[in-house]
Amino acid sequence: MEKLADLNYTLGVITLLNDTLHNILEEPGMVYFPYIVSALTVLFTMHKASLPAMKLAMRTFQCSYRIIKRVVVTLINTLLRLGGYNDYLTDKDETEKQINRVVKELRQQLTMIEKLTTREIEQVELLKRIYDMMIVRHDSEIDMSKETNQKAFKTLHDWKNDRSYDDNTEVIAPL
């Protein structure tokens, strides 16, 4: 017990392990040793972490299949990521969720496109009406049916020769 607490002894053990690993790695056949060790470490950790989850899943019959499937998919995805692959596995529920999300987004985009198209059509019609109103037409083409009757009003020449309505006139009211 005293040897375990001794710092020099601990450093000696660590030095011995490092020297052993360096001697092993110098051999040409052991180039892949660190990769193998890291993969085995991950597998051991996943094994230790997944066993309690599997035991719990087996006790509950209702969700055991889903939990086991989820654990297996997670394990495979972890191994794929450790291997450097960007692909991953999905279960059926996850795929259906993604499909539903994509369909929902497509419906929203279609309604937005429909609204925008309706607005654009209305704007084009409004621009056409404005353009039609701005076009210079000949006198024969102008529809005078909506114009007021100009004959009842005095012209500018009549105003010059006649008395102005602005002149003060005396108004006598009967008492």
From Swiss-Prot:
Membrane-traversing stretches: 29-51
Family matches, as SUPFAM superfamilies: Rotavirus nonstructural proteins (SSF58030)
Glycosylation sites: 8, 18
Family annotation (InterPro entries): Rotavirus_NSP4
Keyword line: Activation of host autophagy by virus, Calcium, Enterotoxin, Glycoprotein, Host endoplasmic reticulum, Host membrane, Host-virus interaction, Ion channel, Ion transport, Membrane, Metal-binding, Secreted, Signal-anchor, Toxin, Transmembrane, Transmembrane helix, Transport, Viral ion channel, Virulence
GO MF annotation: an example: toxin activity
A Pfam family: Rota_NSP4
Subunit structure: Homotetramer. Interacts with the immature particle in the viroplasm. Interacts with host CAV1, early and late in infection. Interacts with host integrin ITGA1/ITGB1 heterodimer. Interacts with host integrin ITGA2/ITGB1 heterodimer. Interaction with microtubules blocks trafficking to the Golgi apparatus.
HAMAP family named in the record: ROTA_NSP4
Protein's name according to its UniProt entry: Non-structural glycoprotein 4
Organism for this UniProt entry: Rotavirus A (isolate RVA/Mouse/United States/Eb/1982/G16P10[16]) (RV-A)
Lineage: Viruses, Riboviria, Orthornavirae, Duplornaviricota, Resentoviricetes
